[in-house]
């Protein structure tokens, strides 16, 4: 049963004006999701990856958790599991999607990117595209998005080792792109734990990234550029490295995850910050903070409405009996 939840919005910026509470309304679309990670939608049906190894298929009031059959056992480490997930552009015909997951092999953990195919309400691993991306318990990255060029973009974390981010022989701490021949090339370097990708309507690529003890970042990503970690972070500058357009600063932590553009603003899911941040990328200001739902993992816009999922069951939140939840903002 859907229930209306009233939201409070906090306005940030130069004016420091308070806006009226209860101005926005969020509606529960689906409850009891199992550590959801990435929101997709096709023909009004939601497909949401869950870290435990399932895809939550939400069709109206019906929620089905469909099993994902993988070639190796999912890792149960702190931030690991079935993470990034994006439907292929031809999903309606092929029923295929890309996925990013963590697995254990001979006492070590790795990430890989694969193609999944949906058949008889199960998802089968069909092809491995990148394998044995080294990782540890943390900093997997894991966001998958299809760009305006039709190519797959993948964010990969530094696996907890800052040296990886500046190592051109490692995919860790990078954003990579799948080329037409199926190979992957490094698109940008110098990242710590990038978890959000979104394109502005003008084609500009934006990225959200976890900083080290605050200093979370929103970056404009350009091919071949170096974003500086661990040499610079936050508002620091140095020749040859790119400084973010927006940062949380050294005294606040957002832990940003999924991002999307909605009606001209950048919406940012915030885990540690327990909010959906609404940002103006032209001014560099955080204009609103939508709070009261706990940890937020991903955001999604269908052009008309904004949706987000909580992550209160991930071991770091305070879950209610309905968590985790897919919400719709009105």
Which sequence ranges carry the predicted segments?
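Acidic, Gly/Ser/Thr-rich repeat motifs that build Ca2+-stabilized beta-propeller blades
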Residues: 16-154, 204-207, 254-286, 304-315, ...
């Amino acid at each position: 049963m859907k229930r209306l939840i009233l939201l409070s919005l906090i306005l940030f910026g130069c004016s420091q004006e308070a806006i009226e509470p209860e101005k926005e309304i969020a509606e529960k679309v689906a409850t009891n999701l199992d550590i959801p990670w990435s929101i997709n939608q096709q023909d009004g049906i939601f497909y949401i990856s869950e870290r435990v190894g399932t895809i939550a298929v939400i069709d109206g009031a019906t929620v089905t958790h469909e099993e994902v059959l993988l070639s190796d056992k999912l890792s149960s480490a702190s931030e690991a599991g079935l993470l990034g997930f994006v439907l292929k552009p031809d999903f309606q015909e092929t029923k295929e999607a890309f996925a990013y997951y963590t697995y254990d092999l001979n006492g070590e953990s790795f990430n890989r990117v694969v193609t999944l195919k949906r058949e008889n309400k199960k998802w089968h691993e069909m092809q491995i595209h990148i394998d044995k991306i080294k990782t540890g318990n943390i900093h997997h990255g894991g966001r998958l998005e299809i760009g305006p060029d039709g190519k797959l973009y993948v964010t990969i974390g530094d696996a907890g080792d800052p040296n990886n981010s500046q190592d051109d022989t490692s995919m860790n701490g990078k954003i990579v792109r799948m080329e037409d021949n199926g190979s992957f090339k490094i698109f940008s370097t110098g990242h710590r734990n990038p978890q959000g990708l979104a394109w502005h309507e003008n084609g500009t690529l934006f990225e959200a990234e976890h900083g080290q003890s605050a200093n979370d970042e929103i970056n404009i990503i350009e091919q071949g550029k170096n974003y500086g970690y661990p040499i610079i972070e936050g508002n620091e500058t140095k020749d040859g490295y790119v400084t973010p357009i927006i940062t949380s600063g050294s005294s606040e932590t957002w832990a940003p995850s999924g991002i999307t553009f909605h009606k001209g603003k950048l919406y940012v899911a915030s885990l540690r910050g327990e909010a959906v941040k609404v940002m103006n990328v032209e001014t560099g200001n955080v204009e609103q903070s939508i709070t009261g739902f706990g940890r937020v993992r991903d955001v999604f816009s269908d052009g008309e409405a904004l949706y987000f999922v909580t992550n209160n069951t991930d071991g770091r939140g305070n879950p209610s009996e309905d968590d985790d939840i897919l919400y719709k903002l009105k």
